[in-house]
Amino acid sequence: MSKPITDHAATGGPEPARPLVLTGNDPLAEHLLRICAAAGTDPRLIRGAPPRELWEEASLVLVGDDRAGHCAAMPRRPGVLLLGLDLDDAGVWVRAVQLGAEHVLFLPDAETWLLDRIADAVEGVGPPARTVAVLGGRGGAGASTLACALAVTAARRGLRTVLVDGDPLGGGLDILLGGETAAGLRWPDLAGSRGRVSGAELARALPALKRLGTLACLSWDRGDTPAVPPEAMRSVLAAARRGGGLVVVDVPRRLDPAAGQALEQSDTALLVVPAELRAVAAADRVAASVRMRLDDVRVVVRPPGPFGLPAHRIARGLRMQLAGVLDPEPGLAVDLEQGVPPGIREGGPLARFCGAFLDEVLPTVPAVEGGVY
């Protein structure tokens, strides 16, 4: 049965900074407490003037218009939002200036925006992850293998990395990584996800793969769930991107609504094309669909043999930037059967290609603790 991930407060470690709610209006207080609960946090509710210490340390300050006057003398700080009570009261804008509020909000119209703003404050969101979609120009082009290798290479560098299996008919990327028995959620568990998904909760819920300490993989299982709704793909990818680092999505050639959503959230797409005439013709049709959703589409050429088409001609014919040529990986078929993750062998064609590509698109992303171990 599909189970949506819901946000809740993290356990263990230091207590995260909590939002501060300042209002004596009971309906407004109840509404704000419900929104905070949906964002995974338990705010402090104060009905009078707040202590200065709480004002300064709160992750976000939500001030009801009925308490704006009580707070006007507090020191200026970022993250103050004023909740208006009367749409016809023009004085709320004057009080917002006196308070130093960043925004004036009216509920319920601003509820979705406020939910995201609270969750961002609680999670401490930084720059979003670079998101790369990988898909094949024809069947069997090796897109899934390249997607796994990109994620493995990033994890070996200590980057926070999330690999997302966007192909429900691909058999499961966890098998390619040798992690099909690893405990954790798969796509059928998340098919009901809607709205805001906590990035921290998602990272904890996904399988932790042996030897790949910073790599989390959201894979399909071997069940009979045919697809996930685009809303679930949107929510899960948004959560994965909020943590920074790299997100890699393996996208099917036939773009269902969820795959289309994955492309729209990506920064770059890599189209893997064997250097064969029919493969290039097929890739041209795939590329037309991809370009409708994403501007930065690059071709990765796989030479099938000495008589294949030159890579630069393929790129020119597809009207794409050439990301590079991916030579055959010796022993790859045996490695995959034995559960050896693609790209794990340093110095191999996969690792070299992925390293060069990551140097180009992620030149300044810092590593996190815990790489390959």
Which stretches of residues belong to each language-model region?
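Acidic-aromatic/histidine active-site loop/patch
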Residues: 1-131, 181, 185-200, 285-297, ...
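Short gly/pro/ser/thr-enriched loop/turn and capping motifs at secondary-structure boundaries
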Residues: 88-90, 111-113, 171, 277-280, ...
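P-loop/Walker-type NTP enzyme "switch/lid" segment
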Residues: 166-245, 332-338, 342-344
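Conserved catalytic-core segment of NTP-binding enzymes
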Residues: 232-337
